[in-house]
Each structure stands twice: as structure tokens, then as C-alpha cells.
Amino acid sequence: MSNSLGKLFQITSFGESHGDCVGVVIDGVPAGLAINVDEIQVEVDKRKSRAKAHATPRCEDDRIEIFSGILNNFTTGAPICLVIWNKNIDSSEYERTRSKIRPGHADFTGFVKYGGFNDFRGGGRFSGRITAGHVMAGAIARKLISTIGIEVIGYTAELGGIVAKLPKTKDIRQNISQSDVNCPDLTATKKMLALIQQAAEEGDSLGGVVECLGLNLPVGLGEPVFDTLEGELAKAMFAIPAVKGVEFGAGFEASRLRGSKNNDPFSIQANHIRTTSNKCGGVLGGISDGMPLQFRVAVKPTPSISLSQPTVNIDTMTNTSLEIRGRHDTCIVPRAVSVVEAMTCIVLADLALRAGMIPRVIKQ
């Protein structure tokens, strides 16, 4: 398995869905960064469901424990180890259906890849549960990039085909705080919640789109040709279970435009070179151009549904059917927002360190 991401700001994820714990080790964090457990806990708590309609019945406390790397609320420069203990575990449903591979999950590929020795309970290493570690690391990264003024905002842009109308950037964060699905369009929020409730009653699930903005990025983040800003972000996004697509700026829409319509004209704005539009999503040649970073992440419907689905009994090699009765979300899109934000912060922290924009010791 490959469980590490990043070069200078490097995270190593560990744990399984129904194991003792999930966690992360973070290497390369500069010494002297002011951070306390409450700041990390705030980010982890954002990952929890706010509305019963789309919430998993598995309610974990998710209290963070700091094992190393932080002393008296400052980073020491040593590896930071953060852990969350799994306490609310029920593996009975997975034991009952162990021989039946779940459609849409990694049961089949994981079984073949690891010879049947992989932890199948709750999806094991393939579960969204492991993203709790990503979010803890993202909290450290968020604090680090804030020292050079970078801010990251994510939100639900689409859910079950309902598309949000986006307000001005300055209003997005306030509106998100009032939405149970992390959507800045409060009218769309009501429709999304109703649709989630309907899907839950039908035993089905929903997907959607998370949009993410990176504000105040300096020009120069990204290491062409193989560690571009887009490339590193895309790799990080695809490490999130359920992500099936990523597009930057105009994305696939750009393929339908002429160059005269797709190009972002340059101009001088407040003594800085900027563009008058942002179809490139803040990235040119794999390098940040000083405009807002903007990209979208497609999240598939939760594959665990209670409807009967055709599948295979991997022990007897016969066709069969499966009805999943476990504890699952109807829609994970609202919860994925915090994970997308976290992974974005991690990538930006790594690239900022590689570009020499953040010192190895943070002086207050």
C-alpha cells in the first residue's frame, strides 16, 4: 500500500474503519507554529453530519489525542502524531455478508490485491473513516498556510442534480454555517435536504459536487512538469474515497469554447498582474497565477444502499443478491467538504514549503 503524501509536508495515514484507531503522522512541519488541540478538533468536528437526514447512525466522539510533535501549543519540528480512537464499532453486518462483494465498493479489488487478507470490516483501509486522519493533518496545514495569508473554502455546489447558485465570495462562509449540507445557497439547501430524505426513505443514496476555493495564493506554487499544482491536487482528491472526477476552472466546458472565449486577459490591478476572468481556475502551466484557485470534485452516490443488488458470492463463485443493512450515510457530499478542504491545505502547505515561501522556523 502507498499511505504517504507530500515531499516536505508529508503525511502518513494509518488505521482501518473497524480497527482500534485512525490517525496520521505529519513530517516536515516547521517548528514554532502555534497550534492547539481545539483548533484541530474544530476541523474534525466539521467532518460530522449536521442533519439526521444524511447522517450515519455510527456516531463517533472523534476526540483527538496528540502523541508527539506539539509542546505547550507550539510545533517542535518533530513528527506530529495524531490519533482518534474508534469506539462505536459494529462489525456484525460485515461478518454476515463477508462472502458477498458489495457493488460500488472496493471489496472485490481489495480481496484480489491483498489475497483476501485485507480488513473487510467497514471497508477497512478503503473506508471514508480514514479521512479523519486527513482532516487532522489538514488542520495543521491550514494553520501553516495561513501564515502567508492563504485561505481555503469548500462547499457543496451540487447534490443529487440540485445546483447551488453561488453568492459573492465574502458571503459564502457565512451562508455555509447556516446550511446543514454545507451549501452557500440556502434555498437550494432546503431542496437538497428534502431530496436526501426522499432517497433515504427509498433505500437509495445520492452524490454531488464539492467546489473548493484557494484565496490569496502567491504566484509560483507548483513544480512542473510532474508535480504541478493541478496534478498534486488531483492526486490528493482521488485519495478521498468516492471521488470520481476533478476539474479546474472552466474544466471540461473549456473544451467547447474557442480560444478567444477561454483565454483570461491580463491587466494591471493594484500594481499586480492579474487576469480579468478566471477560466483557468488560478493555474497556468501547472503554477498558481495569483488569481483564486478554483476546482470542483465529483463525489459518487454512497454505494451502501438497502435496495437489493445483484452480486457474486466470492467463496462459492455463484451469482447472488445483496441487501445492505449496516449503518451508512444516504449522502456523503456534505461531509466530504471538510476532507476536500483538508487535502487542499495539505497540498498547498507542501508546495509552499518546496517553493521556499514558508520558513523552517515560524517566528511569532
Curated annotation (Swiss-Prot):
Entry function: This reaction introduces a second double bond into the aromatic ring system.
GO CC annotations, alphabetized: cytosol
UniProt protein name: Chorismate synthase
Assembly and interaction partners: Homotetramer.
GO biological process, one term: chorismate biosynthetic process
Species this chain originates from: Dehalococcoides mccartyi (strain ATCC BAA-2266 / KCTC 15142 / 195) (Dehalococcoides ethenogenes (strain 195))
Disulfide bonding pattern of the chain: none
Main EC class the enzyme belongs to: lyase
UniProt binding sites for NADP(+): R47
Binding site for FMN: R125, F126, S127, G285, K300, P301, T302, P303, S304, R327
EC number: 4.2.3.5
Cofactor note (record): Reduced FMN (FMNH(2)).
Keyword terms, alphabetized: Amino-acid biosynthesis, Aromatic amino acid biosynthesis, FAD, Flavoprotein, FMN, Lyase, NADP
One of the record's GO molecular function terms: FMN binding
Cofactors demanded by this protein: FMNH2
Biochemical pathway: Metabolic intermediate biosynthesis; chorismate biosynthesis; chorismate from D-erythrose 4-phosphate and phosphoenolpyruvate: step 7/7
Keyword match Flavoprotein: yes
Family in the record: Belongs to the chorismate synthase family.
Catalyzed reactions per annotation: 5-O-(1-carboxyvinyl)-3-phosphoshikimate = chorismate + phosphate
Family annotation (InterPro entries): Chorismate_synth, Chorismate_synth_AroC_sf, Chorismate_synthase_CS
